[in-house]
Structures are given as C-alpha cells and as structure tokens.
Regions:
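Membrane-embedded alpha-helical bundles that constitute the cytochrome b-like, heme-associated redox core
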Residues: 1-224
Length: 224
C-alpha cells in the first residue's frame, strides 16, 4: 500500500530524483572518520544541526504549556516542570541544549577557521555561518527571560543596559526590543517571546537553508 501511495505521488511530483540526489551524494574521502581519524572534526557542523533540531522540537513542546505574560509565565513553567508528563525532561533538554548548541557551533567555527575553509570561494558561506552564530546567541538570550524569575529579570536588565549604551541607535533599539525603555515588564516579556519563537527561528531556518545550499554547491573544503 505504501509503495502504491509513493508511486502515485512520484508520478505527479517526480520526487525520486530529489531524494536520490540527497541520499546518493558521496561523502569526500577526507571527511570519512572510518578512513581518517582526524575527520571527526568535520562532524561538528552536523552535530550542531542535530542539536538544533532537538531544540526546535523541544521548544515546540514547551510552547504548548508556556504562557507569555508576567502573571502566569513562572507558574506555567513550574506546572510544566512538575505536573506535565516528561515536562522536566523536555525542559531540561531545551535548557542544556541551548548551551550545547553554542559549544558545538563554536567548535565548528574553530574547525572552519583553522582549516582555512572560509577562504575563496567560500567567503559568502562563512558570512552566513557567522550570522547563524549571532542568531543562536540571540535565541539563547531571548529565551533566558521567558521563565520570568529574578535571575532572568536581572540578566535581561543588564542586557538592555548594554544595548542602550550603543551610540546613536542604543535607545531606539532598546525600545524596539523591550517595548518600554524605562521598565522591564509585560511588553518586554511578550516581545522577547515573539522574537524567540517567531522572528529568530524564521531567520535561522532561512540562513541554515542558504548554508546547506552553498555547501552542496561548493563542496566541503579539504584539510590544510
């Protein structure tokens, strides 16, 4: 039955060449850990993507219970962690995954830098990767406020003060991010939630798509 369904879809959309192109793509010899022990460093990018997928899936689960307002945010997190089945595990995955994805991305960036993989013709992909790194940092920062506890509140105040100190654009940028330039409150929490759940993930998916397309077009650089 599944074969007939696949054949029916393939007859109309011709999807076989698409997944064949992905599945049959040969891995370069120098990135195969089975033949070169040092090739494990090429896995950092794939591991970063794997952790990112876990972050997306666990984040989708968390949004089903989280309430982004100052009266119910902390209570919703408490309920999720103590009353929802596997809630503590999923939140723990999301919490520690946020740190792990930064570590993996840092290692991936070091590998690219020290092996000179950012050089011609891959300069554009390096720029895209740096933008992904900044988006990941922003995701970690905006997600830090969402539990709405004292630690998150003071950390956000410090962050907004740093933003405000920027010349010329500091105050307008703080107002845009926080909603209210004078107090960290309901507008700040709502905006951080929207930025964390909608704006930054959209930017991340677009940049990752561009990153993967460029990798397929240009290939994986060799060792120095």
């Amino acid at each position: 039955m599944l074969n007939r369904m696949y054949d029916w879809i393939d007859e109309r959309l011709d999807i076989t060449p698409i997944w064949r192109d992905i599945a049959d793509h040969e891995v370069p010899e120098h990135v195969n850990p089975a033949h070169h022990f040092s090739a494990f460093v090429y896995c950092f990018g794939g591991l970063t993507f794997f952790v990112t997928v876990i972050q997306i899936l666990s984040g989708m689960f968390l949004t089903m219970y989280y309430v982004p307002d100052i009266k119910n945010a902390w209570e919703s997190v408490y309920y999720l962690q103590n009353e929802v089945a596997f809630g503590q595990i999923v939140r723990g995955m999301h919490h520690w995954g946020a740190s792990l994805v930064i570590v993996m991305m840092f290692l991936h960036t070091l590998r690219v830098f020290f092996q000179g993989a950012y050089k011609k013709p891959r300069e554009l992909n390096w720029v895209v990767g740096v933008l992904i790194f900044f988006v990941m940092l922003a995701l970690g920062l905006t997600g830090y406020l969402l539990p709405w506890d004292m630690k998150a509140l003071f950390a956000t105040k410090v962050t907004l003060d740093i933003v405000e100190s920027l010349p010329f654009i500091g105050v307008p940028m703080k107002t845009l991010i926080a909603g209210d330039p004078t107090i960290v409150g309901a507008q700040t929490l709502t905006r951080f939630f929207a930025i964390h759940v909608f704006f930054l993930p959209a930017a991340l998916l677009a940049l990752m798509g561009a990153h993967f397309v460029l990798i397929r077009r240009q290939g994986i650089s060799g060792p120095l």
